[in-house]
Amino acid sequence: MTITLKYFGSLADITQLREEQFTFDEETISVSALKSKIESSYQNIQNINYTIAVNQMMSDLHVKIKDQDVIAFLPPFAGG
């Protein structure tokens, strides 16, 4: 399975990436498992509150990610 990860705001600064591809042997992976993998790769992300969206839909940690899904890591946004 191959998925696309997109990082925004301070998360892009930490990873020094806007986007990357991840490949897994599994057919699916939970958002929770992906979050753990990302936080072990980019440890400073653990210090930031962020939301995860799967295919442009806000997601909880139990959602299953499938091949070709696009996962966005979104820091808090302010605006008005």
What kind of region is each of these model predictions?
Residues M1-A78:
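Ubiquitin-like/PB1-type beta-grasp interaction modules and other compact soluble beta-rich domains
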